[in-house]
Each structure stands twice: as structure tokens, then as C-alpha cells.
Amino acid sequence: MKMEANELSKIYGEGENRVTALDRASFQIMPGDFISITGPSGSGKSTLLHLLSGLDQPTSGRLTYDGQDIYSLSDRERSALRRRSIGFVFQQFHLLPVLTARENILMPLLLDKKQPNEAYLEQLTQLLGIGSRLTHLPHELSGGQQQRVAIARALIAQPDVIFADEPTGNLDSRSGGEVMEMLRAIHEKMEKTLVIITHDNRMAQMADRRFSIVDGILTEVGGR
């Protein structure tokens, strides 16, 4: 899925309280891109992710998915598009404590009243190294394993794009490195578009395209 932002802006407040969180960003995300976005706290990184994923509306500008202006859709249509096309990974794992790893992974399908593809589930969990942990509850898993479960949950509906907001921020250096390698493997082996917001320079350097955002201004700064 091709994503294209044109003069995308987000402004909060008015008058002296006016804050430009994103200032006229224009860029494309092509199918299969691996993109990292870095910047200081409060620079607009999360605002950009929320706009790109349709979780928030811009003050001005346009965002299209394969030519479709997503902000011309109703909230219900945009929500359905997110469920079908986008997976999310966050710093917090957001696993339901009373459900097993398998049940947590399958939750998006259950909410959408879809049956799981068992072959795909096995491929996904083996790739992430959690195939033997599917009957475990979250508290029985390490932090790194819990994040792998969260990644599998983001991928179970086979979305086109994965948005990851500080996916290693809650992990120690070793577990964070393992999660980084797994995200790269998913990008390469499953040909998923991957957009990562990170403070981790190691992860940023792994991306094919690197962006920096400072005071709401987005700049492409390089790539591999």
C-alpha cells in the first residue's frame, strides 16, 4: 500500500497557546519501505504517527492510501481500514493478563469475527521465537517475549503496514536488540512496510529511509 502525505499539518490551541506539532509535511511511503523517525521528546513524532494511521485528524493537508483520501472517510470506514491495513506495536505491550499468548495474538481476529489461519499463525510465531510459549499467560513471559507476542498480534490480520512507537523503549539492551532484529526479519521475510518511531539510534540506523523531526518539521536525513 502506497501512502502519500501532502502538506500535512497539525496545530493545537490558539493565539499565545498555539502549538504547531507538525508543519506541512510532504512525503511518500512506498510498499516495502522500512522507515525510522527520530527526534527529541515533544518534537511531533507521535503526532505524525497518529495522523499517518488515521487515529487523529490533521488541521490541514491530505493523506492518501493508494490514492484514497482517508480523511474523506467516515470514522467507521477509517476504523475498518485501520483494522484491515495497519498493525500497531507500542512501548507498552497491552496484553490482556487473563489471556494466553495465543489468545492475545488472535484478539484482533476475534474482534473482527474472523477465523485464524493456523499455518500463518505457526509461521509467524516460529519466526518470532514464541511458538513454544503460546499457552503461557503474560506474567509467565519475559519482557522481550511479551513484546514478541504484541508484534505477532499486530501482524495476525496480515496488514500492509506496521507502525511501531518506541517498540524497544520498555526493554533492556539485550531484549531490545533481539526485538529490533525480529522487526527487521519481518520486514525482509514478510515484505511488510515498517514505520518505526524510536530514540534508539541502533534501530534508526537499520532503516532503509531515515527521517528526523524537530519542532514539527520533518526532514529525510538518509538511509542504508
Model-derived features: positions:
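ABC family nucleotide-binding domain
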Residues: 2-213
